[in-house]
Structure formats: C-alpha cells, structure tokens
Amino acid sequence: MANSASICRPERHTTSEGNTLTSLTKRALTGLALAGAASLVLAGCAAAPDASDSAVPEIDYLACAVSDEGSWNDKSFNQSVYEGLTKAQDELGVQINDAESASPDDFGPNLQAMIDASCDITIAVGFNLVDAVNAAAEANPDVNFVTVDGWSNGATNLKPIGYSMNQSSYLAGYLAAAQSSTKVVGTYGGMQIPAVTDFMTGYYYGAMAWGADNGETVKVVGWDPATETGDFIGDFVPNSGTSKSIAAAQIQAGADVLFPVGGDQFGAVSEAITEAGIDGRMIGVDKDIAASSPEYAEWILSSAEKRMTNAVYDIIKAIAVDGEAFNGDYYIGTLENGGTALSAITNYSGAQMQSELEAKLEELKAGIISGDINPLG
C-alpha cells in the first residue's frame, strides 16, 4: 500500500515542446528522469487529511494517459478518457498521471514521460498516437499500454480499444432523417481517418434507411461512402472558422440536421444554424452533449456516444483491483455491450410521433445487435 500521507494536487507545467504534464501522485515524482520531456513540480500543498477523511484508500497502482492534440477538457474524445482515469482514482484509489499533447511532436516525449514515471498502464488517446504507442510498446516490452482507436502491430503489451461507431451512428442518421423537414441532412469530419468516417458511414446508411422505410427521398451532404469523398476540417481544433464554414455550406445546401464528427464543433454548428435563421438541429458525438455541454442543449437532437470513460475505468479496475493479468486482446465497444449508444432524444419536432420513432429505433438497435441489419450498408 502506497503511503498517502503527503500526497497533494500539483500545478500543471508546460514543457519546452509545448506539452503539458500533470502528476497527481507522489510515486510519479520518485526517481523521476523525464529527459527533458516534461517537468513536474508540486506546489502549494496543504496538510494531508487524516485517513478517515478519505472514502477510498489509495492503492499502489499508477494509471496514466497521454492525450491526442488538444486539452483534456475538449468536451469530447480526450475528456471522455480522462474522466475514466479520474473515475478510477476517485472510486478505486489508484494514482494517476497524465500528459496533454499540444501537437504530434509531443506524442513520443509524452509517452516517454509516462514510462519514466513508472506507470503501471499508459493509455494513448486517439488514432493519431498509434505509431508512437506501438513504438513505445515494442521498445518497452515490460510496460503496459492501451491505444484508444488504434491497433497493435503485434506487441502483447499493447491493448487496442475500438468502437463500432457505425452502429449508434446508423440510429443517429435514421433519427436525423425523421427530424429533417427538408430531408437533407449533413455530416462532416475532423480528419478523413477510419475512426471518423465510421461515424459518417453509419449515419449515411441510417438516413437512407429512413427514406426507404417511409417512401421519401433523403439526401446526405458531406459524405459519400461509395466514393469515400466528403467534407473534412483537416484537424480537430475546436469550433474553428473552417468548421463553421463547412456547416454553413451544408445548411445552404438544404441540410437542417448536422452531425459534426470532429470533437467539439458544436459552437461552430450552433452559430451557423443561428446565423442562417433555420430551425436546425445537430447530433453530438462521443459524449451525451446535451448533458455534458448544456450551452448547446437547445440545438441537440441526440448524440452517438463512444463510451470511453467506462472502457478505461473497466480496464484499470480489472487489473488494479480484480487482479486480472494484462492482455493485448482487442476490446470493441458495440451497442450490445454498451460501449456505444444513442443518447436520449431531445428537441424533436419531426412529423412522425416520437414514441413511434423511439420504438422503431429500438427495433433497429435489436436488428443491428442480431446481425440482421448491416449499418455499413
């Protein structure tokens, strides 16, 4: 059992590369050799509370994470993983350590910082880190890693987490078409990578399914899975001018329900909807955006959730508390195992009764789980 008598919450410090490292552990500071990748300084520590004040005793397990570009409070992908990390800290008593990546140049140094901090497990967040985390795993066979939305090149100490986001996105597309008064719905992505286009393809075929079921023509702008062409921002910078321009162009093309798959683009889309003066909606990604970002709630129809918080927590719990051995087996989140889901419907005003639509969505969900419906067309 680690001694928690002098544990305190430190400040963040930015490294010369622009990345930010946070340590929440005493252990991570012991014998620290970060080779210039980051600095960790404890400051302003108050007196440690009595053990009786802590609901969960600290355990000797250090769980770490390295973000994709952006911050942990991106209201989307990074934040979902970070919340799994802090949930494990709060409920299980594990110690945690993390590093934010300002750019791809930070991926390697940040992973090395976690290795040097003697992390028991390090979670690399996002497809963009896949090369760096595979290299780190191969160079450090005794260190355990998890890659979210990535894959393993064969290292047994690297566990991939993936999601069948086409499944919940199919339901989102069906819902979007039901809501739309123009029967034109839109989608666009941050970058054209499989972790993004998987959402967009499911959405496309879900919208087409609503049209087929109801004898109406539905058009999807922003993505064509047959030609693999569509609208992409080129990065995941939150609420960029490019994002707003794409949303505005899709609205100009008739779309009144938009599905931006690029992290937090909901400010950009809501502005485009407001400026166009339409009764538009948007569908969130990764988290239940109506709940997590109430400032956007009035425009949110639903969200295609990628429940990374649960997956991260469950993996840490299995090893740190339940005593299971680490393995490199692929975890895939699906509708069946609750790894992905469609959030509650809000702000619906389509012609079809909401109760009937919700019953149909449950029917479609069951069909996807059974294999009778292919959300990829």
Task: Give the residues covered by each predicted segment.
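Repetitive helical segments and hydrophobic/amphipathic motifs
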Residues: 35-36
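C-terminal motif of bacterial Sec signal peptides marking the signal peptidase cleavage site
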Residues: 39-44
